Amino acid sequence: MATRNNGKSKAAGSKSGGGHGVGPWLGLGVIWILLDQLTKIAILKTFAYGESRPITGFFNLVLAYNRGAAFSFLAAAGGWQRWFFTGLGVAAALFIVWLLKRHSGQKLFCFALALILGGALGNVIDRLVYGHVVDFLDFHLRGYHWPAFNVADCGICIGAVLLIIDELRRVRR
């Protein structure tokens, strides 16, 4: 069964109603990309590759390159991974834009997707421009270092956690 809304057909029970369309969510994604890219530019201008500067007892800024995916997965592959992960990031971004269009009224869901979109495209830009992802956030404890990451990765992780929270809330309703 379909209902009419401003002359557009919408499936009954659709959860996308309301909202201001996809524009604000795409805008948030662009803001996240800019934050990611500006921080990377600042690090690239002030650090030599491998240089590390302690900030606290558990956090350093460091310039590291990642030719693979999360945790340097496939970093040592023969170079094909650059294009594979670039294509994967573009495909994910297109799917996210489609989801944003379908569900623009679901605030938490779309906020999460916008962060993931910004993060995915931030890392795609790195792969296209540099041939690798620029990482610089280094957390450590008692000699163990979490793999270095960046603002784009933060967007992806925060977005993923928010998607889980959104789904848990939806299941409870």
UniProtKB/Swiss-Prot annotation:
GO biological process, one term: proteolysis
Main localization (coarse): membrane
Positions of transmembrane segments: 24-44, 55-75, 80-100, 105-125, 145-165
Protein localization: Cell inner membrane
Key words of the record: Aspartyl protease, Cell inner membrane, Cell membrane, Hydrolase, Membrane, Protease, Transmembrane, Transmembrane helix
Pfam families membership: Peptidase_A8
Protein name: Lipoprotein signal peptidase
Species assigned in the record: Ralstonia nicotianae (strain ATCC BAA-1114 / GMI1000) (Ralstonia solanacearum)
